[in-house]
Structures are given as C-alpha cells and as structure tokens.
Amino acid sequence: MTIANTPAELLASSISTLASRYAEKVQAGENADTEIASIVSACKDLDALVTPPESWNDRMAMSYTISTAIALLLNWDVFQILAAQAKPTSLETLATSCGCSKSLLRCALREAVAHRMLDELSPETYALNSRSSCLLDENKAAWIHYLTDIGLVTAAYLPKYVKSINGKIPEHSHRIALQMAFNVDETFYEFLHRKDPKRGVNFDKAMQRHIKGDAQASIESVFDFSILRPGAVVVDVGGGKGHHCIRIAKKHPHLSFIIQDYEANGPSDGEDTLPEALARRVRWQRHNFHHKQPMDGADVYLLSNILMDNTVSDCNRILTNIVDAMVPNHSVLLVDDAIDTLSEDSHSAYSSSMNLHMLSCFGTLFRTQEDWLMLFSEVAGGKLSIVSSWMIDAGRMIFALRRKF
C-alpha cells in the first residue's frame, strides 16, 4: 500500500529540487533570480502550512516588532560596534558601549536574531552576518533607518487615513497619513528639509543608495544622449543633488545641464567640488516644479521619480508647466518612474509593500501602464505624445515624450 505524501512533504521535496537548481546555476555563473523567487515562495508556503493559524495571525499582526528592533539597533550603532569588535561580542560589552540597559538591548537583539539579522553564536554573544553587514554601508543603513522610522510611524496612521477618505484616493492634494502621524501641514519633502532637517539628511543618504545601486540601470543606458547637438541643454526637474546629471555629464562632455530643486544646494555627497571643466557645464537653479518652468526651449527635460510622489492633479500641473516650455517636435521629456505591472512575479510582493508605503507618505499609488497613458493624454489639452518607452529593472519605466503642437 502506497502512502501519499503530505502537503508539507511535497513542498519540502519541491524546495529541495529548487535548491539543487539554484546551486547549479550559481556554480555555472548564471542568473538564478527565478530559482531564488521560487524557493522563497515555497518556503513561505511551507511556513504557512505548518504554523497554526492563530500563531500565524499573531506573527503577521506583530511584524512591526522587527522594524522597531532594527531602529533601536541602528540608533545605538550596534552594527558598527560589532564591526569594530571584529569578533563575537557579549551582551554586557554591547550594553556598555551603547549606554543602555542589558534588558532593553537583549530584547532588541533577540528579535534581530529571530529574524536572522544577527547571529547568536553562544548564549548572549552576538556577531554580524551577511545581512547585517550590509548596514555598515552608510547609505544602505540610512534607507533601512528611514523605513523603520518614518515608514513605521506613518504606516500606523494608514487605517485612519484610509477611513478619512472613505477608501477612495482623491486625485487632488489632501491630508495624508504622514501629516497625521507627525501633526504637520507640510508635504513629505517640505517636512523633511524644513521641519526636520536631521531626517532630511538621512533621507538624502538613503536616496543615494538607490541612485548608486549597481543593479539599477541608468537612464543613459536606454536614451542616447550622444545624438544631441553640441551645447544642448538638459534640465533635470526636481533633480536634487544632481546625481543623474553629474553622471551623464561625465559621459557626454558636449552637453550642458541645469539641475532644478527647491533648495538647489549643489553637488551630492562625495561630489562637493566638481572638476572645473565639469562645473562649467553643470549648474543648479532654485525652482518649484509646481510653478512655471523658467527654462524655455531646452533640448531635454528630465523627471526622475517625481510623478510617483504626486496626485493626478499635481502631476498634470507639473507636466503642463514643462510642456509649456517645450519646443514642439524638438524638446524631449524623459519620465523615469515606477510602474505597477500587475504581474505575479517576485517583484509584486515588494511592489505591494511599497504601494502601501507610498500611500502613507504621499497619498498616491504606483501607476499602471493604463494610468500613465491616461495621465499623458490629459496633459495640456493632448499636446504630449509618447515617442518611445522602455521597461527597465523590475517595476520601472522610462517614457520619452514630445510636444506635438
């Protein structure tokens, strides 16, 4: 008599097979993203299958505790202390270095160990692992700190916010979860850079983590800036510290760049002094993109991760201001932004999480392809037309648009 395998055994067998495929691809130097996603999904299924429903629900509802623990450990510089020790470190030593009580630190450390953020090599003796070692990078740590600070606080107000809008996101500016959480009237960026500059500095560092990430394709990898005429002007609207323009300017010495932002404070960290030849071609201009675009007739206007932070009505205003400055059938508008592909791939879970984060901080969601097409068609009486588009990275789209008339 053959005994059928239980669902748990079938899943375990599937995980074993997938793990073998993963190992083979890694050894062959091939991309194993598909296998990684499948293994993670199958392990989650197995976890859910063998965990009692009440225990599972408790764990899901209390998932904020790891965010809290990471925030505490970052605030106490625990990861840097462990790195400086260069060996497994006792709770007693860590508590002395942090200046906090052992009982409080123990609580945070246990949570980190339970979620595989730290290793406990012997009772109350801790060490970094590959995951926590990533947080020794200042920019990567800043991103995680942002998520466990502003992200966690604003998320707590999301149910209240959604109730206030009756479950329907307005297309116009309105009071959002971030403003409720911190009791402010300012928008996200105004709050960070004017009301809470310390958090603003941390956020700027966090954004460098994304911009400098090796996995992120650059905009110049899909749009050929070399075809532009000598002396052509590229205007980066909302360009912040100028990460994109400085990078492109180094590759294309025949172009000039204007970086527009609220503060227009100059180069990013690590670029405090631009080489003279580069500095002659790159300048900053104070500009609020909700107002009239001061640079008429530029060859290229760049909007990178700007529209995702704004409601439909605000996006329409931002785009109209640029369209009014464009030369018909000449100027190019490059929109580099997030897109919701509505797929069921491994990216969709992260996209769903970030969608809730966007809703908390900006009162918006990632747009689908249909949403983007609708938005562009409604700008300035239909003056914009898409001439090219590229899907790059997971959940990221670049549109090239021209003014028709």
Curated annotation (Swiss-Prot):
Any one Gene Ontology molecular-function term assigned to this protein's record: O-methyltransferase activity
Pathway(s) this gene product operates in, as recorded in its UniProt entry: Secondary metabolite biosynthesis
Keyword Acetylation: no
Main enzyme class: transferase
GO biological process per UniProt: methylation; secondary metabolite biosynthetic process
Binding, S-adenosyl-L-methionine: 238-239, 261, 290-291
Keywords attached to this entry: Methyltransferase, S-adenosyl-L-methionine, Transferase
EC number: 2.1.1.-
Top-level taxonomic group: Eukaryota
Main function: N-methyltransferase; part of the gene cluster that mediates the biosynthesis of the benzazepine alkaloid nanangelenin A which contains an unprecedented 3,4-dihydro-1-benzazepine-2,5-dione-N-prenyl-N-acetoxy-anthranilamide scaffold. The first step of nanangelenin biosynthesis is catalyzed by the indoleamine 2,3-dioxygenase nanC which produces N-formyl-kynurenine through the catabolism of tryptophan. The two-module NRPS nanA then utilizes anthranilate (Ant) and L-kynurenine (L-Kyn) to assemble the dipeptide product nanangelenin B.
Family: Belongs to the class I-like SAM-binding methyltransferase superfamily. Cation-independent O-methyltransferase family.
Protein name: N-methyltransferase nanE
Source organism of the structure: Aspergillus nanangensis
Lineage: Eukaryota, Fungi, Dikarya, Ascomycota, Pezizomycotina
Gene symbol of the encoding locus: nanE
